[in-house]
Amino acid sequence: MRLSALKNAGRTPSLPMTIELADAAGPGQLQLLSLLRVLPGQRYVGAAVWRGRAVLAKLLVGSKAARHFQRELKGVRLLAEQGLTTPLLLADGLQEGEGGWLLFEFIDGAESLADAWQAVEGLPPLADEQTAVLAEALGAIARMHAKGLWQEDLHLDNLLRQSGKLYL
């Protein structure tokens, strides 16, 4: 299917799905396996396979796709340039009338800080376990701010941890 078809796919498109994309290596097929975040008609984020490699795909469609793509790409580059820990951007592209895509390394076995918080939110307020999750989140925000960066849609699902590393 074409990327632009996602514009009309709604909140729960049928998966898995194959989407035709092209990068510097030429045309290829992205196999979208599951969705992690959906803004219907605008943004679809999920686990996928690209050229035999597991990736996290951010697919941007609709009338604001180009603007959202440019903002996402700029943000990813700024994080990397400032030496902040972020998944490696493997491929990206923007095609007029279709939309944009960013394909990142898939951080296997990562846990979002949202999931970590859910595991401890029922504890008494300010339990050590809650304080540890909040400290990780606030530490990440502080590191970004120290580099002159901020994230407009900051939430705990955007912070992933794996093997002692926190990814932005």
Please give the residue ranges for each predicted region.
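Juxta-kinase regulatory segment immediately upstream of eukaryotic protein kinase catalytic domains
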Residues: 1-34
